[in-house]
Amino acid sequence: MRTSTRPGVRWMPYADAVSPWSNVASRASSALAALAAWSLGAALTVALVGCAGRSGGAGSGAASPAPASRSSRDASPAALATSPVTSTREWTWRGVNGIQVDTHHWTIRSSLRSASFTGSLPAFYEAALRNYRTGLVPLPAPPKRLETCVFGTRDEWARYTEHRLGADAGPYLGMGRGGFTSGGEAVLYDIGPRDTLSIAAHEGWHQYSQTTFRSALPVWLEEGIACFMEGFRQPLGSPEPVFLPWRNTERYAELRSSARKGRLSELRAVLEGSPQSFLAVSRDAQLSYYAQVWAFVHFLRDGDGGRYRPGLERMLDDAVRGTIGERIRACDALDARGKRLAAGAKSGIWLVTVYLDPDFDSFERAYDRFVGALLESNGWDRILRGECPIDLPAPAPEGAP
């Protein structure tokens, strides 16, 4: 997969497996009705209720829920004063009827059957963007509104996918549950509130990087950060989620399951691969890949006493500025051939050498220790609270060897 300001395609099939903590989704969904009123205001919620009764396609999406209750439509003035919504209008596409919601940074087109679910999207997306811009290193605002389509059924999503991707649609139509991003636009469908929002956060990172970064990140970092951005908690009664990168039960469960089943790959294989190359092996291999790059970004941020965080921050800063190539050319740890290969590579260990550690073997051992500690932790309580499941060593003092 390639992150580019030019039209490109990236996608993320999402796990169908139910984690040991699947009841998290039911708790999160209880806040969605109130979220609609706080996020969009009473007028928009009423408009959405009108859309919810339409006939839909014969896809695999969830059945249309009952309209939002009166209490969920009674927005408080204080909440409405901070609404991220700038405009709303009806939206139709080839017989699909829905609503378009514009915020300061997003254009969201929805044919979701649930008014409250649609109502939750503006606040969620604006909070997600703030997380992209602050979760790892300060990053700039996108140069334009980011566009998202969230369909109410898989059938609607499939028809739009064929329209959007043409002859390239086949692999996406064949995946289980998921979404994709093409040319900065994310295309999703309803697979339940919690999972849909997790995919929205993942694909939203791809939208942000495609439109904002001048240099592409390596695949392992692009996908790893997208997974890192998935974790969130929805406080009951709050219009906005709290993003917590460790609160990702699917990735943590998959990491542990892959280890038990002997499916974890060596770090070099992860860095040299891609979601497509792992999917060519099996869907399980691909899900293991996503879990490993999720853990890898946590390692880069916090592992080995925070040793690698400055390099991670430099790489992101250079991607924004478009200066990754300059950094490669200035790297003394690579010879001329290595610099040529690094400049043209979308994956591999080259940027580890440039930004993180010239001694890859030592770097890999540190990563293995970090993942080993995660696997031994069985820290479900901490994961559910959005906390690191292991006790991390304190960062080394500034200037220490």
Feature-to-residue mapping (PLM):
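Sec-dependent bacterial lipoprotein signal peptides
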Residues: 5-6, 13-16, 21-49
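Bacterial signal peptide processing site
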Residues: 52-55
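Post-signal peptide N-terminal segment of mature Sec-exported envelope proteins
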Residues: 58-92
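Acidic/His/Gly-enriched intrinsically disordered linker/tail segments
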Residues: 168-186, 213-400
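Intrinsically disordered, low-complexity segments enriched in proline/serine/threonine
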Residues: 9, 15, 22, 37, ...
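Short linear motifs in low-complexity or flexible loops
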Residues: 6-7, 74
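Juxtacatalytic substrate-recognition/specificity segment
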Residues: 80-81, 93-218, 235, 324
